Amino acid sequence: MPRDHRTHLFNLGNCLWHSDSSFRPIPAKFSLLSARVVNPKGGNTEFADMRAAYDALDDETKAEIEDLICEHSLMYSRGSLGFLDYTDEEKEMFKPVLQRLVRTHPVHGRKSLYLSSHAGAVRGMSMPEGRLLLRDLTEHATQPEFVHVHKWKVHDLVMWDNRQTVHRVRRYDQSQPRDMRRATVAGTQPTVAQQAAE
């Protein structure tokens, strides 16, 4: 695929911190990624632990964000890379959905931040105020002490829980082959009752 192809450029959004499918009303539960062909330079995947990041917040911040609701859309994440023109069909497909900023894991009950580059607005806040809050929280949550860097080898298989991690791929040499196969396990419930995110 040519480097200037729209699909290729659109997929560069995977270099931003994100949680898979947070732009869907019912986001993904797990993801699995398998390495078939590894790029010789770059292409590591970084994972940030949103449980540890939440635990490290001060009590005042935890109280401030406890009940906040964010709007998630692919138009937010791709917009930050300069994608501003969408067809009417894409606008309908990528309509913002609502997600809680703080999630409680349904199995072990531990709280975590639910951040993603797809989050572009916070309900009840002005756009600049909400985006600054999300940026501050993302900078906090992706500090080195919360991040695992996976350096891929052929046949590696990594599985993660999207409900308590964010991840991103690092830049790599686009002139060299790279073959990664991903599977995603669908979630079973929304993080918040959906309303029209207008």
List PLM regions with ranges.
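Non-heme Fe(II) oxygenase catalytic core, chiefly the N-lobe of the double-stranded beta-helix
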Residues: 1-157, 162-198
